[in-house]
Each structure stands twice: as structure tokens, then as C-alpha cells.
Amino acid sequence: LYAVQGWLFNHEGTRRGVEFVTRKITQNVARIADEFARKENFEPLRLGNIDSKRDWSDAEDFVDGVWKMLNQEEHLTYITRKKPDDYVLSSDETHTIKEFVEEAFNFAGFHRSICRWEGHGEEAKYYHGDDLLMEVDPKFYRPAEVDLLWGDSERARKELGWKPKTNFIQLVNKMVKHDMELLT
């Protein structure tokens, strides 16, 4: 029996469900950018803990990694003479939800040079000039919040020749662009 176990850290993309924080961010950033451009009043994005760190990668990169895992038997037979093994797929870096928010708004035209954070923790707010873009709302804190999820894909990189092609900023931009296009 050929069996492989893959540990896939947070993998995001344009098809991610809206119930996940990354898609909640990109969908709301697109909405806010659209309403701002039309000079309409808008409700800010509301999130829970923006200080938790995640190891985010593009789901498309993981498809390639999973394919390599499932086809490693041939690859490993010739190179290392090992049996199929288990691997972690991850970006090997972490970013806070706060960083995701900043990148998303930056891509949508709310440039960092004009935006600012006020307050910390449950009091954190993100402004563009006088316009409130995002605020922390304690009701969105999860009771069993994990502060840090961080992978180590060194083995998959060495043994399978896998590595992510999409970096964090590219991933955020891709997701925001997709949600902005859905509004046009």
C-alpha cells in the first residue's frame, strides 16, 4: 500500500470560503475600496485578534507539493532509495493578521504612507486619514485562539524539490484583486 501523509499549513486563495479570516479581510477591503471610490459611507472591517501569527501559502503551490508527495516513489527510488514518506508544506514564515490587513488595504489603494494604527489589542483601529477602515471587535475573538502557527517544509524542499512560488504579498494582492473584480 502506497501511503503518504501531508501536513498542509494555512493555504489560501481566491476560492477560500468567506468564513475564513483571510477571505473576510479581502472581501471587506474590496467592498470598502468600492464604496470609498464612490464617496459612499462605509462600515469598517471588524476583526478579532489581529496579533496572531499564521504561516500562509497559496493553495495553488500546495497542489504542486501534494502531486510531488504522491509521486515521490519514483523520484525517491532513483535518488535516495527511501520509501515514500510524510512531508510538511508551508511558507516557513509567519505574518500577523494585522500585516494581512495592511497589505490588503495597501493593494486596494489605501497606501501605508497615509494609513495609521491607533491603539493596541482590543482597542486597535486602522485609519486612512480620518476614515476608519478596520477595528478590533472583541466579539470576534475565538475562545481557543492559537497565537502562532508556523511550519517547517525543509524536508519537502530538499527531498521533493518543492518550494512555494507565491510569496505573502503576492498572495494577499491576488486575493484582493479577485474580490475587487467580483464587484465590477
Model-identified regions with their sequence ranges:
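A glycine-centered loop/beta-turn motif at secondary-structure junctions
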Residues: 1-3
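Conserved beta-strand scaffold in the Rossmann-like NAD(H)/NADP(H)-binding core
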Residues: 5-7
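Conserved catalytic-site region of short-chain dehydrogenase/reductase
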Residues: 11-15
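C-terminal substrate-binding subdomain of Rossmann-fold SDR/epimerase-dehydratase oxidoreductases
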Residues: 16-184
